[in-house]
Amino acid sequence: MTNLRKTHPLMKIVNSSFIDLPAPSNISSWWNFGSLLGVCLIIQILTGLFLAMHYTSDTMTAFSSVTHICRDVNYGWLIRYLHANGASMFFICLFLHVGRGLYYGSYMYLETWNIGVLLLFAVMATAFMGYVLPWGQMSFWGATVITNLLSAIPYIGSDLVEWIWGGFSVDKATLTRFFAFHFILPFIIAALAGVHLLFLHETGSNNPSGLCSDADKIPFHPYYTIKDILGVLLLILVLMSLVLFSPDLLGDPDNYTPANPLNTPPHIKPEWYFLFAYAILRSIPNKLGGVLALALSILILAVVPFLHTSKQRSMMFRPFSQCLFWILVADLLTLTWIGGQPVEHPFIIIGQLASILYFLLILVLMPITSLFENNLLKW
């Protein structure tokens, strides 16, 4: 009798995705982040579900309901901080996952890559709406500032903003709809992640060398299941350390003050994982230009596959491209730092230079360097 896992309609899907899947024998720990993102999503959905049981999406009671969760619900503080810091871990894994894709040329799998870019947008939208829900000062003003950016769209801008707000300012209607979207989006993300995997398994995984690995495959289980479990344990270790020792390390103290439309905080800034995009937005003095640059800072990822001029897929054997890649990483860290600083000298000019360098590296310097490397190898 054939093994049940290979014949049962449901189990054979699991079998071909996680057990008997042929995987390259040389994929490094940089390939762990896909499974870690799956674990992050599960943690977020579960903790979010339990938070939603006690949260009320009303401007009068939202802040106090979060306080109630932390003070009165059994382990409510743990669930709340797991959810808040789980989002940070989610984005750390996301950035490393995207960075891996850029470094090793995984973007050459176009469908997988484009679904990934879509997933990134969906996760960013979900995180933004989630940040509004506790209804603290930074929640309210962050929502006001970011939604207001849409008013820069010609002709329909102001109507669009009022339509999203459900009124003439960020108020009860806005909070209620943000809660509804924040609840449904993670399930859409889970479905998209399934499509992401579907497309990936059409081609098989890339590997550090960027070469075809068909001649040397190993079964996913037990080799990569064990490797993924190690990654998950490390993720949980870091997350629990953060939650139990310094849960507010990555948060904003302003969010412990209830939202007050009459009092603007001195420095309005989003969560740390949006700071790089926020810095790019602020570095352009024109409102519409800033909004376009903000959108393009993420959308540029969709253009990357068409800018691949190298005859090699991976950067493993391309030292000049490697150098530019790490300059890009340093540039993004600089932008993240600038996004959290006040708008004054010298931060303004540093932010503008870092923003120019970001687009210059991806659109111009990397493709030219790849062509140069082709010539060095007489290709």
From Swiss-Prot:
GO terms for molecular function: metal ion binding; ubiquinol-cytochrome-c reductase activity. CDD domains: cytochrome_b_C, Cytochrome_b_N. A ubiquinone binds at H201. Pfam families: Cytochrom_B_C, Cytochrome_B. The keyword Transport applies. The chain crosses the membrane at residues 33-53, 77-98, 113-133, 178-198, 226-246, 288-308, 320-340, 347-367. Component of the ubiquinol-cytochrome c reductase complex (complex III or cytochrome b-c1 complex) that is part of the mitochondrial respiratory chain. The b-c1 complex mediates electron transfer from ubiquinol to cytochrome c. Contributes to the generation of a proton gradient across the mitochondrial membrane that is then used for ATP synthesis. Belongs to the cytochrome b family. The cytochrome bc1 complex contains 11 subunits: 3 respiratory subunits (MT-CYB, CYC1 and UQCRFS1), 2 core proteins (UQCRC1 and UQCRC2) and 6 low-molecular weight proteins (UQCRH/QCR6, UQCRB/QCR7, UQCRQ/QCR8, UQCR10/QCR9, UQCR11/QCR10 and a cleavage product of UQCRFS1). This cytochrome bc1 complex then forms a dimer. This is Cytochrome b.
